[in-house]
């Protein structure tokens, strides 16, 4: 994921979450908001309840690779992916399948 495609600031996260537009499943919650840019900006959040820093960073790396495999970054959206505890209990393929399912739900809502 390129640097220009990432959401980092807390105010950007809050702006997207305040819209309350979301889709969710057992492994992820995705908050989204349309933007005026020609590309998507994506933020990943994994809470402290998920585990220690090593586990949280590993899950973020896995989510980034899932996003690189499945998501079209040329869409004009802000997206925040929140990782749930069930993510750790599943293997990569099942998490990938869950993320694809959420993207299909997101496409129906847009």
What are the functions of these language-model segments?
Residues 1-110:
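Positively charged, solvent-exposed patches that mediate nucleic-acid binding
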């Amino acid at each position: 994921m390129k640097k220009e495609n990432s959401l980092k600031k807390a105010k950007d996260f809050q702006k997207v979450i305040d819209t309350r537009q979301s889709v969710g499943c057992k492994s992820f919650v995705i908050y989204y908001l349309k933007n005026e840019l020609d590309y998507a900006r994506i933020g990943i959040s994994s809470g402290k309840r998920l585990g220690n820093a090593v586990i949280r960073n590993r899950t973020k790396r896995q989510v980034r690779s899932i996003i690189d495999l499945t998501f079209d970054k040329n869409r004009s959206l802000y997206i925040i992916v929140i990782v749930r505890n069930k993510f750790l209990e599943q293997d990569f393929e099942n998490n990938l399948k869950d993320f694809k399912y959420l993207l299909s739900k997101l496409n129906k809502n847009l």
